[in-house]
Structure formats: structure tokens, C-alpha cells
Amino acid sequence: MSSIVPSMHNNRTIIIGIVAGEASGDILGAGLIRTLKKYLKKVRFFGIGGPCMQSEDMKSWYNIEELSVMGFAEIVMKLPRLLYIRRNLARRFINLKPDVFIGIDSPDFNISLENRLKKRGIRTIHYVSPSVWAWRKKRIFALKKATDNILVILPFEKKIYDHFNIPCQFIGHSLADQIPLNPNKVSARQKLGIPHDVYCLAVLPGSRIREIKMLAHDFLVCAKLLKNNFPNLEILVPLTNQTSIKKFISVASTSVKYRVLSNQSAWEIMMAADASLVTAGTATLECMLVKCPMVVAYRMHPLTFMLAKHFINIPWISLPNLLAGHELVKEFIQNNCRPENLAQTLINLLNNNNQHIVLKKKFRQLHHSIRCNADEQAAYAVLRLIK
């Protein structure tokens, strides 16, 4: 890639603006920053990022959790603050004049910001396509106006943008590059101190506080029902920060014994598990990549669900099912997301070794399909825009 890094870039400091709005974007942003630093001797990063991006020397102007909102009701409640942050970011970036701005996911926040910056002559990239194939398709045209390039992580997304002659590049997902095709479950268990002869369930109630509030209690009730069938069951709960841990403990309120883990990545914990109970989102992708059987669940505010049901026109919400184009893993949404439903499906999964074999084979095929050296490709796209 060194051939696309002109020598002029080595004689001045390159400024890159970058905004991620949640934990999954923080992971992608950190990988991109790390890769760009390999090719640019003098480079600085400003915007909004979480602990992963900040560990790569990015200067974050706001706490990433301020952007991590979900559902109609919560967005309305926090809208004044979100609008203030976006206005302030636009002002700061216009004054800073970064060589490139990258908005990672969070389309409702980032597309408008990208549009303002592009009008001021700042090159822009949107990293992770919004779900235009599911709802609000007109965002395609907003992206066309707001960006110089779109980096998509799912294979079928590129065709959508190609149809409208919008610059777009399929790069896969950096987690697919990071996670081995053949995960070592024995080693993963040893690191966590889990005996080889016990059942292990990973419980992932989400990265947002609202998700934890909606799902944590029922997830643990499900785990308790599961423990009645598997008395030696070990329950692991990966959570990323103290705010999430405190909320989980306050909401959980059940007598079942569990272990909260914050020093390991979610995928390392799921690699050690026999099955996972997962909130819809990036965690379903991580679970697929470590070849762990899963049950997917989601619940949202009733008003948000009513609106979503009216506008969204896809049969599945989990990434494994979307990638496969058919149901690979069971999904339980809203009123179907009940502990007894989740527990019975997990019991069936744990008792069906043949299903494990079929799932793991399919998961491996899907892993291959998005293992495309994403960080390098994303960095290449950024470097091409730097004048």
C-alpha cells in the first residue's frame, strides 16, 4: 500500500476526523486508526470514540455513550443534547479542516454531519451502511450527497449502491480477520478457568443501557431455567464498562449464580461457551465467527416496536440470518422474547450435537465470505482521499 502514500503526506501532519457512536463502531475505528498509523508518519485523530479508539491515541471530544441511544422514545428524550453535540462537532471540524472525515455507523447522527462537512470541502467516508435494504431506503440518496465513499461490511450491500452509481466498497468485517476460522475452544476455556466437563452459557444482554434494562432480567431467568436441566451450568456475562455492569446487577435480581467478565472481549467468552443467548446486533456476528450455537433475542419500547413493525420489511434481524439469506438461528422478538421460549430453544440446542455440526459448517462458510482484510481496505480508501 505504500505506493498510494505520497511523500508529501510524510512532510506534514495529516488530520483525520472520525465519529463512532457505539461499541461496535469503536472496534472498527480502532482497527482503522491502527492501520493508518502504519502508513502515515504524522497523523492525528479527533472526534468521538470509545476506549478502543482512545487507546490508539485518538482525541475524543465527547463520551461515546452520549451517542449510544436506541428507540424512538429515548432519541426524542435526548434529541436536544444530540443536536447540540452535532452542531458543535460540525463547527470544530470546519475550523480544524481535517483531510478526511469518517463517520462510523450511527447514520442518523453521522450522515447529516458528513453532509455539512462535505459542503465545506472536506472529504467524507461513511463506514458501515445503514440498513437501507430493510427500511428508510431514501437514506441512499442522503448518503450520495453526503459522502465521497461508502464502506460496507455485508456482501449484498454493494449491489444496492452500485445500482444508483454511488461510490461504494465492500471490505468485509475486521472481526472476521481477527477471529480465527477454527477457534480453539479448549484454550478459551483454560484462559477463563472453565473445566472441560461443565456446560457453559454466554449471556449477552447488549451494549446499550436501554438494552440491558429491557433484557437482563429475562435473560437470567432463562439461564436459571436452563440450570434446572444442566445443574453444572456456568453462566458468563461479558460487559464492557462499569456503567453496564452496575445497570446489569441492578436489573438482574435473580438467585442464579453468574460471572461478569469485563477484561476479555465478548467473542473470547463466546468461544469458550457451548451456547450463547445474544441480543441482536454485532454480538450475533461475533458469536457466528467463533462458531458458537446461539439464540437471538430482542425487545424494545412498545412505541418503537410498533413503528418498526410498520416500516421494516425483512424477515430476520440477526446478522447470521441476513448473511445466510435464511433462518440459521432462532430469533425471539418483543412478546416472543420470554424466558421459557429462550430456555427451551437453548435446551434443544445443547442436546443436539448434529445441529452443532451443521451450524458450525455454515458459520465457517459465512466467516469466509466477510474475511477480506477490512482494516487494510478501509485504510486504503481513506488514503486515496487525502490530497
Curated annotation (Swiss-Prot):
Pfam families associated with the record: LpxB
GO molecular function ontology, one term from the record: lipid-A-disaccharide synthase activity
Sorted UniProt keywords: Glycosyltransferase, Lipid A biosynthesis, Lipid biosynthesis, Lipid metabolism, Transferase
Family: Belongs to the LpxB family.
Any one GO cellular component localisation term in the record: membrane
GO biological process, one term: lipid A biosynthetic process
This protein's name: Lipid-A-disaccharide synthase
Catalytic activity: 2-N,3-O-bis[(3R)-3-hydroxytetradecanoyl]-alpha-D-glucosaminyl 1-phosphate + UDP-2-N,3-O-bis[(3R)-3-hydroxytetradecanoyl]-alpha-D-glucosamine = lipid A disaccharide (E. coli) + UDP + H(+); a lipid X + a UDP-2-N,3-O-bis[(3R)-3-hydroxyacyl]-alpha-D-glucosamine = a lipid A disaccharide + UDP + H(+)
Pathway: Glycolipid biosynthesis; lipid IV(A) biosynthesis; lipid IV(A) from (3R)-3-hydroxytetradecanoyl-[acyl-carrier-protein] and UDP-N-acetyl-alpha-D-glucosamine: step 5/6
Enzyme Commission number(s) from the entry: 2.4.1.182
InterPro entries: Glyco_trans_19
Function: Condensation of UDP-2,3-diacylglucosamine and 2,3-diacylglucosamine-1-phosphate to form lipid A disaccharide, a precursor of lipid A, a phosphorylated glycolipid that anchors the lipopolysaccharide to the outer membrane of the cell.
Keyword Lipid metabolism part of the UniProt annotation: yes
